[in-house]
């Protein structure tokens, strides 16, 4: 089996906290130097690389003299702010040894949820790659609370892969890859060398939590691979402890777990909608509407809606749930939540008589709807 990285031109590489820190006692300058060297080698092969790096909070803890990761959000944000200084400095100096310029980019999920900011971020990243710069990306933990508590850089790596239409996402961790079961508990567990991204059985295999320094367990990596597949990006989950792992993957050596994107690449606009991590609201739809959306490729009409959850405005991304609560699709709504409550279960011909106007006959047009 040949590594998919060998034939990939544009890569997103995510490096976890444990691979760039001294067990939480600040940044490991030597390790970061090795990553810079391997990425420089990939660049020499004509590959474009965007690096998503953890480590800011761990570095901030070291600089502030903290031995335990704080639980308070404001202290986590303070550590991130202090640590980002050191993280940027080390990467800049190590890549400079290879005559490579770096750029620091701090993103939040909100940046990628807003269409205009999303396109601006994409334009900036593509320009940096064209100029031969290696972008170093991290979540902007200093100003965001939800991401510190629940977010992870695996997901961010997948979002960036979709943003720049990367060929592959490489998630480097302190584990060998995905196993059929937890190898710490099951001696019969074997490494999954290759599977389809998004295969349902993968989520059942992926268990366990991340280390005390990082936030992402194996499940987040599996879900990240599923998300990256939206843009056709394959994913490799491999151990960053393997010597020259990036160089070996680029040479075609199969290391870790390969998750292949089998689904057709989404159109850019639909991909952006699918990548929304936090939708504004939900509509519950009946079984007939579920069938029309999933099998018929139809638009969502008001008559198929049986419930409205949350508050949303026209033009915002909302999720469509089945009666069982499973997300079926998401898309841009033509009506606000207040308007939707008035027209639900009604045929489109009655919209004007209920509201006094009709913007569109559909709640979500099929061109603005994506299955998930």
Swiss-Prot record:
<dbReference type="InterPro" id="IPR015947">
    <property type="entry name" value="PUA-like_sf"/>
</dbReference>
<dbReference type="InterPro" id="IPR011529">
    <property type="entry name" value="Glu_5kinase"/>
</dbReference>
<dbReference type="GO" id="GO:0055129">
    <property type="term" value="P:L-proline biosynthetic process"/>
</dbReference>
<feature type="binding site">
    <location>
        <position position="141"/>
    </location>
    <ligand>
        <name>substrate</name>
    </ligand>
</feature>
<protein>
    <recommendedName>
        <fullName>Glutamate 5-kinase</fullName>
        <ecNumber>2.7.2.11</ecNumber>
    </recommendedName>
</protein>
<keyword id="KW-0067">ATP-binding</keyword>
<dbReference type="Pfam" id="PF00696">
    <property type="entry name" value="AA_kinase"/>
</dbReference>
<dbReference type="Pfam" id="PF01472">
    <property type="entry name" value="PUA"/>
</dbReference>
<feature type="binding site">
    <location>
        <position position="14"/>
    </location>
    <ligand>
        <name>ATP</name>
    </ligand>
</feature>
<feature type="binding site">
    <location>
        <begin position="173"/>
        <end position="174"/>
    </location>
    <ligand>
        <name>ATP</name>
    </ligand>
</feature>
<feature type="binding site">
    <location>
        <position position="153"/>
    </location>
    <ligand>
        <name>substrate</name>
    </ligand>
</feature>
<dbReference type="InterPro" id="IPR005715">
    <property type="entry name" value="Glu_5kinase/COase_Synthase"/>
</dbReference>
<keyword id="KW-0808">Transferase</keyword>
<dbReference type="InterPro" id="IPR036974">
    <property type="entry name" value="PUA_sf"/>
</dbReference>
<comment type="function">
    <text>Catalyzes the transfer of a phosphate group to glutamate to form L-glutamate 5-phosphate.</text>
</comment>
<dbReference type="InterPro" id="IPR002478">
    <property type="entry name" value="PUA"/>
</dbReference>
<keyword id="KW-0963">Cytoplasm</keyword>
<feature type="domain" description="PUA">
    <location>
        <begin position="280"/>
        <end position="358"/>
    </location>
</feature>
<keyword id="KW-0418">Kinase</keyword>
<dbReference type="InterPro" id="IPR019797">
    <property type="entry name" value="Glutamate_5-kinase_CS"/>
</dbReference>
<dbReference type="InterPro" id="IPR001057">
    <property type="entry name" value="Glu/AcGlu_kinase"/>
</dbReference>
<comment type="pathway">
    <text>Amino-acid biosynthesis; L-proline biosynthesis; L-glutamate 5-semialdehyde from L-glutamate: step 1/2.</text>
</comment>
<dbReference type="InterPro" id="IPR036393">
    <property type="entry name" value="AceGlu_kinase-like_sf"/>
</dbReference>
<dbReference type="InterPro" id="IPR041739">
    <property type="entry name" value="G5K_ProB"/>
</dbReference>
<feature type="binding site">
    <location>
        <position position="54"/>
    </location>
    <ligand>
        <name>substrate</name>
    </ligand>
</feature>
<keyword id="KW-0641">Proline biosynthesis</keyword>
<dbReference type="GO" id="GO:0003723">
    <property type="term" value="F:RNA binding"/>
</dbReference>
<keyword id="KW-0028">Amino-acid biosynthesis</keyword>
<dbReference type="InterPro" id="IPR001048">
    <property type="entry name" value="Asp/Glu/Uridylate_kinase"/>
</dbReference>
<dbReference type="GO" id="GO:0004349">
    <property type="term" value="F:glutamate 5-kinase activity"/>
</dbReference>
<dbReference type="GO" id="GO:0005829">
    <property type="term" value="C:cytosol"/>
</dbReference>
<dbReference type="GO" id="GO:0005524">
    <property type="term" value="F:ATP binding"/>
</dbReference>
<comment type="similarity">
    <text>Belongs to the glutamate 5-kinase family.</text>
</comment>
<keyword id="KW-0547">Nucleotide-binding</keyword>
């Amino acid at each position: 089996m040949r590594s998919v990285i060998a034939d990939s031109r544009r890569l997103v590489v995510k490096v976890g906290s444990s691979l760039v820190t001294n067990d939480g006692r600040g940044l490991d300058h030597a390790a970061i130097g090795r990553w810079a060297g391997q990425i420089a080698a990939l660049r020499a092969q004509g590959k474009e690389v965007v690096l998503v790096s953890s480590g800011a909070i761990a570095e901030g803890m070291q600089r502030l003299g903290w031995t335990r990761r704080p639980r308070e959000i404001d202290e986590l944000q303070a550590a991130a702010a202090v640590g980002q200084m050191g993280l940027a400095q080390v990467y800049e100096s190590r890549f400079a040894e290879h005559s490579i310029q770096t750029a620091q980019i701090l993103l939040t999920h909100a940046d990628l949820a807003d269409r205009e900011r999303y396109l601006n971020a994409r334009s900036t990243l593509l320009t940096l790659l064209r100029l031969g710069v290696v972008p170093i990306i991290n979540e902007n933990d200093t100003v965001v609370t939800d991401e510190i508590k629940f977010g992870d850089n695996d997901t961010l790596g997948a979002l960036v892969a979709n943003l720049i239409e990367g060929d592959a996402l490489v998630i480097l961790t302190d584990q060998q890859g995905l196993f059929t079961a937890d190898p710490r508990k099951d001696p019969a567990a074997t490494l999954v060398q290759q599977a389809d991204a998004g295969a349902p059985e993968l989520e059942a295999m992926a268990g366990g939590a991340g280390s005390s320094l990082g936030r992402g367990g194996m499940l987040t990596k599996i879900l990240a691979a599923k998300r990256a597949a939206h843009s056709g990006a394959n994913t490799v989950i491999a151990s960053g402890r393997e010597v020259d792992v990036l160089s070996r993957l680029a040479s075609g050596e199969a290391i870790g777990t390969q998750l292949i994107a089998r689904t057709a690449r989404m159109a850019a606009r639909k991909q952006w909608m699918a990548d929304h991590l936090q939708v504004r609201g939900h509509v519950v739809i009946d079984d007939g509407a579920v069938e029309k959306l999933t099998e018929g490729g139809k638009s969502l009409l008001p008559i198929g809606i049986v419930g409205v959850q949350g508050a949303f405005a026209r033009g915002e991304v909302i999720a469509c749930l089945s009666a069982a609560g499973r997300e079926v699709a998401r898309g841009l709504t033509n009506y606000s939540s207040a308007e939707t409550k008035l027209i639900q279960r009604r045929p489109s011909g009655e919209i004007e008589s209920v509201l006094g106007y009709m913007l569109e006959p559909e709640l979500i047009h099929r061109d603005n709807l994506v299955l998930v």
